[in-house]
Each structure stands twice: as C-alpha cells, then as structure tokens.
C-alpha cells in the first residue's frame, strides 16, 4: 500500500533530574555538595532510508515517545544520556508542524538526518550551585521537558521522470511495458489512485526511475479530483513526460488536453513551466490519430519534442526511451531541498523557529488571577523542585531578575493576589 501523507505526534525525552547529595567520607567533616546532573533526554530524529518508498509504517503507529535521561547520582556522577529515537523515512519526505504549518525538515539524500523534537537537558545537581556565599546548596534542578509537537509527514516522490496526463491516456500501460512495475490497469478513469515507481532500462543500457502519477483533470491545481495530492509528486521529477490520447477516443481534443494539463502544472507551481517536457502522442494505432497529430504539431513551437507511440502495439517505445534518457543527460541536477516561496518571490530554506527565551506575557483569568506565560518562565517552572524550599526561593529570585514582579505591579497586582504559572498557583507578596 502506498501512503504519502500522515500526521503523527512526537514527544522527546525529558532530561533526568539532578539530585541533592553531599560527600560523606570518613575524616572529611565538610565534604561539600556531591549531587550529579541528570542525563539528556532523547531527541526524535528522522533519517532518510533509500530502501523505503512509502510512509506506510506511520499509518499504524501515530505516537512516538523518546526515552527520558537518567537521574543524577551521588558522588557527582551524572545520569546517562538517553539514546535518540531514530525514525526512518523515504527520500523526498517533508516534515511540517501541524500548529504553524512551518517546514521543519526537507529530507532528500540517503542518510540525511534532522532533529525535529529535541530532548530536554538534564537538571543540574546541587554541586553546580555551590558559591562562596553558599558552599553547600541544598537544592537541585529537575530535568528540562522534551519538546512535544504534532507533525505532518508528506512524501514527494524522487523520480527522474514523471508521467502526467488526463486519466486513461496510457500512463500505467507505458510503465508496465518499460519496467517490471505492475500498476493497476483498467478501462475506466482513475484506475491509478496512488503513484507507481519503476526502474527503466534502455536498450543501450542507460537507466532511470519513472513515476506513473494518477490522472489529472481540469481544476487539479485547485484540489479538484485530489489534484494537490497528485501534483506534489511532479515537483521533484527532473523531466515531465506528458502523455496525450492523440486519437481523441474520450471525446476530447488532444491540443486542449495538452494546454489544460500544462496550465494546471503552472497554476500549481510556476517553476514547473521551465521543467523539461517530452510529449508522448499515444494510441497512434487508432483511427484519426495521424490527422490529429499533424494538426497538433502545427500548433506547437518547433523546439517541443513530440514522440508518437502505441502502448498497445509497442510501436516506437524504444525511441521514446532514448529520447527520455537523452533529455535526462542534458538536465543538470536539481536541488529539491530548497523550495521557492512563489508568494514572496524569493528562494529560502525554512528552519524551525525558536521563540525568544526572555519574553513573557501577563493576562487575567475570569476569577481575577494573574496568569504569567512565556517560554523561559515556563521552562524554569518545570525545572524547579517545589518540594524544596531553597529551590522555591531560587525560583522567586529568577522571577524578580526577569522583571516579572515589576510587570505584575504595573498591571495592578498587589499583596495577596493570586498568580498562576502553568499548573502552579502562588500568592503575590510585597
């Protein structure tokens, strides 16, 4: 089964907790702090495996949770870092955030890796907080929570050649006779509803990968007939082979078919207009094909390649394969990892956005309580051990140093008012 799009949930591992411990050794009366740091939590990493061709594995498992780092130990021994969770994906996989629709990774080459959810760092043990004023601190840090997010995996096939055209023009039949692929073939529209790949070898021993893409119809660039799902696979082909029913057996005009499909390609991605294209005039064994072909060529520019074939009688198939192989040799390698944002008119690579750590916001709940939120303060909250009074006092000092106390006063917060951070509730004290 071919699966080219799926939504999954990721949870990176939390960092291990640091611990509060002291050196207890005979004849060492003031041994000092000896609490070790926690280990780093495992990250969720995606890696390209060129042996994969589909996202089928993610259809049956949608939730992935990486391991937590080990807690620190006494004698200043650090906890072990957790081993990253590596998820294998096929070449051509794009990973997007469900929340922001931002591209987090674009994986093209075999072995290429991307960290999508980072594991939390380990909490610090009490020996890390020793100072001349406080040589034996009696608090430590909890591990940092690992990142958690939902992502969409989208597969854009990496094929040398993409077959496009209206339904029932002979794309699947062509793939079946030039490769060992076994696509479903039927005398009705949309027999092919998922792309099929085949390795093609020419009589002069050149080879390339050909993708049989589901049939397109007018309006495909707007999503008609699942057009977006089909068109995205065209983006990463080096050469487009445009198949046309030159007999007009479906009651359509071959020239109109050609113009409609090309317009849909351009509407979907403007840069597809410049992609090398070979026109295959199929069904030349049927009546009216020769006359239609002559009229068709008269309407085209001289530099457009048109190859007449019959996938039923197999006439001129070898010549078509030679033409495709020659065209591929002319085409330079295309860097598919850089996507062009046509709305902005610039080339850019999108990386994951890391929010500013210092900003925070203050709002009011319905009951009048003040709610403080922000990446840095929430991270500190999660890493504070609220069972330890010294750790709580340290958290209060951090809030003051960030300017949160002053900001609360400016918002009208006074002695005894309730302040909330995530699931915690505090009383404001002047």
Swiss-Prot record:
Region (Disordered): 118-145
UniProt domain Obg: residue ranges: 1-158
Domain spans labelled OCT: 352-430
Binding site for Mg(2+): 172, 192
Listed EC numbers: 3.6.5.-
Chain sites annotated for binding GTP: 165-172, 190-194, 212-215, 282-285, 310-312
Keyword terms of this UniProt record: Cytoplasm, GTP-binding, Hydrolase, Magnesium, Metal-binding, Nucleotide-binding
Segments forming domain OBG-type G: 159-329
Chief location: cytoplasm
Cofactor(s) this protein cannot do without: Mg(2+)
Alphabetized InterPro entries for the sequence: G_OBG, GTP-bd, GTP-bd_Obg/CgtA, GTP-bd_prot_GTP1/OBG_C_sf, GTP1-OBG_CS, GTP1_OBG_dom, GTP1_OBG_dom_sf, OBG_GTPase
GO molecular function: GTP binding; GTPase activity; magnesium ion binding
Localization, UniProt: Cytoplasm
EC category name: hydrolase
Family assignment from sequence similarity: Belongs to the TRAFAC class OBG-HflX-like GTPase superfamily. OBG GTPase family.
Described purpose of this protein according to its UniProt entry: An essential GTPase which binds GTP, GDP and possibly (p)ppGpp with moderate affinity, with high nucleotide exchange rates and a fairly low GTP hydrolysis rate. Plays a role in control of the cell cycle, stress response, ribosome biogenesis and in those bacteria that undergo differentiation, in morphogenesis control.
Official protein name in the record: GTPase Obg
Gene: obg
């Amino acid at each position: 089964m071919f699966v080219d799009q799926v939504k999954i949930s990721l949870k990176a591992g939390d960092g291990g907790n640091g611990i509060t411990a002291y050196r207890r050794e005979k004849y060492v009366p003031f041994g000092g702090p000896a609490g070790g740091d926690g280990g780093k939590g495992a990250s969720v990493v995606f890696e390209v495996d060129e042996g994969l061709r589909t996202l089928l594995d993610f259809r049956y498992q949608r939730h992935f949770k990486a391991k937590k780092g080990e807690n620190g130990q006494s004698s200043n021994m650090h906890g072990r870092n957790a081993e990253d969770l590596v998820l294998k994906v096929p070449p051509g996989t794009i990973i997007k955030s469900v929340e922001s629709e931002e591209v987090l990774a674009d994986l093209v080459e075999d072995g290429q890796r991307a960290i999508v959810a980072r594991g939390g760092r380990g909490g610090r043990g009490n020996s890390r907080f020793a100072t001349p004023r406080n040589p034996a601190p009696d608090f430590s840090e909890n591990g940092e929570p690992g990142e958690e997010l939902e992502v969409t995996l989208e597969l854009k096939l990496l094929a040398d050649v993409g077959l496009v055209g209206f339904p029932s023009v002979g794309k699947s039949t062509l793939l079946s006779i030039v490769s060992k692929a076994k696509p479903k073939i039927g005398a009705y529209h949309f027999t092919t509803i998922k792309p099929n790949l085949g390795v093609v070898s020419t009589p002069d021993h050149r080879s390339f990968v050909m993708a049989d893409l589901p049939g397109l119809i007018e309006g495909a660039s707007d999503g008609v007939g699942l057009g977006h799902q089909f068109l995205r696979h065209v983006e990463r082909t080096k050469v487009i082979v445009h198949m046309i029913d030159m007999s007009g057996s479906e009651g359509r005009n071959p020239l109109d078919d050609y113009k409609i499909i090309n317009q849909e390609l351009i509407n979907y991605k403007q840069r597809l207009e410049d992609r090398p294209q070979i026109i295959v005039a199929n069904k030349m064994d049927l009546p009216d094909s020769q006359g239609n072909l002559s009229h068709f060529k008269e309407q085209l520019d001289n530099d457009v390649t048109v190859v007449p074939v019959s996938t039923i009688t197999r006439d001129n198939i070898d010549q078509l394969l030679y033409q495709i192989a020659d065209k591929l040799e002319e085409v330079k390698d295309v860097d598919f990892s850089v996507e062009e944002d046509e709305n902005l008119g610039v080339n850019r690579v999108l990386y994951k956005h890391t929010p500013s750590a210092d900003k925070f916001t203050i709002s009011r709940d319905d009951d009048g309580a003040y709610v403080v939120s922000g990446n840095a303060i929430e991270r500190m909250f999660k890493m504070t051990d609220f069972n330890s009074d010294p750790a709580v006092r340290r958290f209060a000092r951090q809030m003051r140093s960030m300017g949160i106390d002053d900001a609360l006063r400016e918002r009208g917060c006074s002695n005894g008012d309730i302040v909330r951070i995530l699931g915690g509730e505090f009383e404001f004290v002047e």
